[in-house]
Amino acid sequence: MSENGTIDLSEIDSSEDGKDLYPFQEAAIQEISKKLNELEDNHNVLFQLPTGGGKTVIFSEITRRYVKSTGKKVLILTHRIELCKQTSKMLTEFNVDNMIIDSKVKSVSDDNDYIAFVAMVETLNNRLQEEKITLNNIGLVIVDEAHYNSFRKLFKYFEDVNILGVTATPLSSSIKLPMNQNYQELVIGESISSLVNKNYLSRATTYSYNVSLDTLKVGINGDYTVKSSEQLYGNYMMQEKLVRAYEEKSKGKKTLIFNNGIATSFGVYDTFKAAGYEIQHLDHHVSEQERREILQWFKNTPDAILTSVGILTTGFDEPTVETIILNRATRSLALYHQMIGRGSRVTDTKKTFSVIDLGNNLHRFGLWDAPVDWYHIFQAPHQYYDDLKSDEVIERQFVYEMPDDLRKKFSKSENIDLNIKAEYNHAMSLGQHSKVVIAKSIDQHTKMCVENADDMWDALDLAKELKDDIQD
């Protein structure tokens, strides 16, 4: 190593050409490299690839090739210690000598032999402010999970180098800080549907249960507040709905549940435990040792249920997950993709997985594998947010679906559907009174009860079972 910190390329292990890459990963590397070569030193590139597509593999190989071809060092920024460790491990597998800069690291001198650094954003920011870290000859900064805004505070220290942001969703976590303010180019990788069709990701089947969200409040971050979510999802009716959805669509499958509050998750734990199911709870308060034990239990238990809050949306990879339950609503497209992506890993015995949506998220964002115009979202994020369906509009489109266990009680009835909205519009077009529609609904319910009852008392009991159908 020379005095100015330039790396001697002969020091880099060139006997290994890196790991085998999938064709779409190699194509992405070529496109990103082309963009980086074309741009000036202070221009930045954003790379989009779905969760499960191997973003860490791609930027680790980019790091290896960049160091080898330029003689400059690479800095990789993460916001979670789990991602920090995973990235460092992957770089090592690519024969890239690297150093983790976390809270345990108090200083870094310039006379180190590392060719790459993996840093926690807050730690690095503090050490740079304290002038306890010297990072000379950095030619490329890679930002993992680049849609988080916490990384922006570090950009001022690297104004003369290229920055490569990596994310599954090129949409900022804050509407006030769009990503196109910091990145000039967007490179779009393989789509979810393409990765599914080529068997790189599992195919999702989504079940959506309609939920009234009119009590939820939106916070300053643009998403639903924890407090209002706890009030909705912590009540008995929603806990009962969650268990019913699990039993209808996921019973006996390894299931990961996402919540928007710790109290809700503990409630989920208690409810499932009381019903006799194997379940564990996980949040950021759990010790590292206990967390390892819980995740090992989850890995080894075929029908395990894990209820969680926030902690497993990034930096967690358990390919054997068979069902994802969204026991929350979100207005964050990034979070929506992150949560569902936790079930998308392929194994030799798993090519499909289920998604149970209890937050109207499907109606808000569409199917997980549906086409998305990422260029439009990157260039015009405000318009994207403006075009999102409101909860009121979503709920006006709801059509009641009778649960399977209730449908069995009305098995003798061929027709159980009555579109109240369509019937109302039809009645109005004929100049009829709205009571005509109510009468039709009563007639239909009466007919269903008579068809499936042995006597009057049975019919009355069946009528009580239809209370949800009447309310919805």
PLM feature segments, named:
Residues V105-N137, Y148, R152:
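Conserved helix/coil segment N-terminal to the catalytic DExD/H
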Residues V57-I58, V67-E93, I262:
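Conserved Walker A/P-loop ATP-binding site and its immediately adjacent core
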Residues L39-I62:
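Walker A/P-loop
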Residues E122, L140, H284-F378:
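Conserved RecA-like P-loop NTPase helicase motor core
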Residues K85, I100-D111, Q129, F266-D270, ...:
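Conserved helicase ATPase core of P-loop NTP-dependent helicases/translocases
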Residues N300, A334, S344-D461:
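C-terminal helicase lobe
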Residues H147-T206:
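Post-DEXD/H (motif II) to motif III coupling segment of the RecA-like Helicase ATP-binding lobe
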Residues E185-N259:
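Conserved interdomain linker/interface between the two RecA-like ATPase lobes of SF2 helicase motors
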